Amino acid sequence: MVEGEILSWAEVQHTHRIRNGVYQRAGRLISLLTDFGRINPCYPDTHADATGETILYTGAGRRGDQHLTPPNRALLAAIESGHCVPLFNKLAPGRWQHMGYWRVADAIHRFDERENRMLWQFTLKKMKGDG
């Protein structure tokens, strides 16, 4: 996969084997999906700066307060391990863009007034090269 490449869901599924945004196995983060809130507004992921090198990624859990579920625990554990994972951005049904490799750098569990619930927010940092 090349950063920026447009992929089908079948191609994304070679890496990200589930439909949920956080794919993990045995507590280790494998890959992430986003749509930057365009399709699923309950996941309001955003670029944190104009450079595009930092993303504020919303944790797992569509309704109600987000808790330390296995996907959110895997995101937290990735801060400690420091490993990089691929991020795929949904452009439209069946069209995904490979966004390169990202490292989970930080996390905060906070009340989001707009969503009226507790959310996990993870800071993703863009990695140079192929991850």
Language model features by range: what are they?
Residues 1-96:
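Acidic, glycine-rich low-complexity segments with interspersed aromatic residues
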Residues 92-131:
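Compact mixed alphabeta submodule
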